[in-house]
Structure formats: C-alpha cells, structure tokens
Amino acid sequence: MAARDVLTKNQLCVLEKLETASGPLSAYTLLDQLRERGFRAPLQVYRALDTLVKSGFVHRLESINSFVACAEPHDHSHSMTAFAICDSCGQVTEMSDHDVDHRLDEWVRSTGFAAKKAVIEFRGVCAKCRAEAA
C-alpha cells in the first residue's frame, strides 16, 4: 500500500477529483474536469489511474468503465470488494468483508483455479430511487 504523501501531483489531482465526485467518473470525464489543472492528454489520466488502482486508492468499475475513490481510505488491505451500482442515479456503494474474502479464497484454492482478478458488481436500483419511483 502506498501512502498518500508519495503520490505524484497528477495522481493526487485525479484522486482528489474522484473523492469529491458525486458518482463514478470515466477517464475522459476526469480529463475534461482536470484540463484547468494542466492535464492535456488521456495518457496522463490513465497513468495516474493505473497507479491509484494498484495502490488501492481507487477502484475500477468494470461494468460501466468508470472509477471511484475507495470508500475505505485508511484500509487498503481488503482484497475483495463488491459494488452495488444504481442504474438510475449512478450511486455506488462499496463493501468489503474479510470473512467473505477468506471464504472465496478458500473456494478458489480448493478448485485449483489460479485467479488473477475478481470483480463483484451488482447492478440495479438503490433504495432511494426505488422509493422515489413508488
């Protein structure tokens, strides 16, 4: 886990933008929002995102090709994170549980499968949007 104080200027700009965003952002949306801070090319954003994802500060949401800041900024030790993504408002809720991690790790090992990556994303409608629709 990298400490926040070792992040580069670009990495810190991207992280701060994600931390203050009201929902997930794509790399190109980040680029548009960071142009005023000197960002000119998609590669600047992608490099920063790559490091932030690897160090646990940011999560990539595979199903919507977007990024969110980690909801647990002081605990990047979780290996398995699940997300609930609202298709109506875009709200993302993050959940990690060491017991779930352990059970999934045991299951994968018992099958002899060599997992490289795991992504758990639930798509649907959040409680607030469901209540508003009722």
Regions found by a protein language model. Name each.
Residues 53-61:
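A short, conserved structural fragment
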Residues 1-16, 21, 65:
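Short alpha-helical segments that sit at the start of domains
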Residues 36-40:
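Short, basic interhelical loop/turn and adjoining N-cap
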Residues 46-50:
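Short, hydrophobic-biased segments on the C-terminal half of alpha helices
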Residues 60-64, 68-134:
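Non-DNA-binding regulatory cores of transcription-related proteins
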Residues 43:
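Key DNA-contact positions within bacterial/archaeal DNA-binding proteins
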Residues 24-34:
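Short acidic, hydrophobic short linear motifs in intrinsically disordered regions
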